[in-house]
Amino acid sequence: LPNLTLPMQLHIQRLVADQRQDWVLVIQQEGPAIRWSMMDLLGIPQARQKLQDGEWHADGLLPPNPEARELFAALLFALTPNAELQANYPAAQQHGAQRVLPEHWDVRYCAPNSFELSLPKGPKYQVTPLNGDAP
C-alpha cells in the first residue's frame, strides 16, 4: 500500500449531468488498517470502509456502497505519491498533471491533493483538501 500522510480530510463533489452532491471524506490510520469515512455536509454517514492488507472491508452498520468503494479505491490511486506509483500500480501512466490507470481512472491535478477524478462510466468527482473549514 502507498504511504499516505494521515489523517486527511477531503471535500468531494460528485458531478453527474447538472447534479452535484457534496461529501466530506476522512481518511485515518487505525492500527494496521486505513479507515475511510464519508459523510454528507450535515454529518450523516454515507459510506465507511476499512482497507487492510490490500482488501476492502465494510466498517460499521452501513449497507454496502459499491460506488463509494470504487471512489475510495480511485482516491487511493490519486493520492499515491509519485515515487510509489509504479510499485503499487504497474499499469499506471503519469503525464505532467495527469495520471491514468487505463480502463479504470483518470486524474487531473490542480495541486497535490486537489484534482478531478473521472471514472470510465461516470461520474466525475472534484476533490479538494479540507483544512478545518467547511465547504
Task: Describe the role of every protein-language-model region.
Residues 1-4, 26-27, 102-109:
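Short linear motifs in intrinsically disordered
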Residues 2-5, 29-32, 49:
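Edge/loop elements at the starts and ends of beta-strands within beta-rich repeat scaffolds
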Residues 16-43:
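Structural recognition of beta-strand segments within beta-rich domains
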Residues 11-13, 44, 48, 55-135:
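Mature, soluble, non-transmembrane domains
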Residues 1-23:
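N-terminal leader/targeting segments and the immediate start of mature chains
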